[in-house]
Amino acid sequence: EHYGDEVVPDSGPLPVHMLGNMWGQSWSNIYDLVYTEESNSNSINVTKIIEDKEIDEIEMVRYAEDFFISIGFDSLPDTFWERSLFVKPRDRSVVCHASAWNLDPANNDLRIKMCIQKNEEDFITIHHELGHIFYYQAYNHLPTLFQGGANDGFHEAFGDLLTLSITPDYLQKIDFVSEEEANLAKQDPIGLL
């Protein structure tokens, strides 16, 4: 309806570029077009929570680190916090596409490069990127031959898998929502997408 039959045919696949995400990974950019919020909607607005709690970019990464620690991974090394890029620098141009780096496995030099925006999409992306980082950290002690993911697809799947853990229960555990809000959100399957 929004774009018309000439752009998006009524019968057929939705062109991936219409999602507003170059990799077709998320529908969040067209959420307002495909979901009409009803008066009894119970979806959780993570962006608003981040704003209301005045959570900064580093704190967003700390939430993700705490998640990985809670499932048995070791803390990130101090060098991660010293050498990663979390906020877009004002003094130079950088490519802001989020990425994870394993620069020196012998010294556990792990970093992310990301111009974090204080919103839900980046909160999820941080968890994805730290999925890569913790995966790197898990195999850095192995012989050089084995210091790599099983394949690139598996590395991406690992990062994406962990983002699926950002559920109402998780948001309750990190004190973003109350138990009642989490339970109400779980009743709205569209809101969980």
Language-model regions: role of each:
Residues 1-193:
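Cation-handling catalytic/transport regions enriched in His/Asp/Glu
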